[in-house]
């Protein structure tokens, strides 16, 4: 699994390097009126910076033998990267297909829902890394306990992580269809 994660990270990094090079090229040549959307260039460069930081955190995570703080930072930077890339995709699609979006008004409820969803995902990441840390502490204190028993030794807040995960799923489905 670790090798697969590294390979995936390298593929994402290379893809973002290509994205950034194309964004700089399109900005310089004003391809498809690209200069009128400087946020795309800024977001592309920002995604390159964030993927480098995420990669360095991933390497540190391996070297630190899954340190909880590094793991949490790595996950949060990965979430930020996905958010930036999502913005780039949406903004690019709107730029290329401007006629489809002419006259379309911003939906403030959808915007607030997406921000709320993002905050819930951050809480989910923090809960998940906290549970993992507590599991590691239980396994150090009780090395002979089977994995299932170690999980049972955790406080009831472990269920909040699962409950929030299902809540995120259903909230995402709800947002998609409304």
Regions found by a protein language model. Give the residues of each.
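Polytopic transmembrane helical bundles with strong interfacial aromatic enrichment
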Residues: 1-178
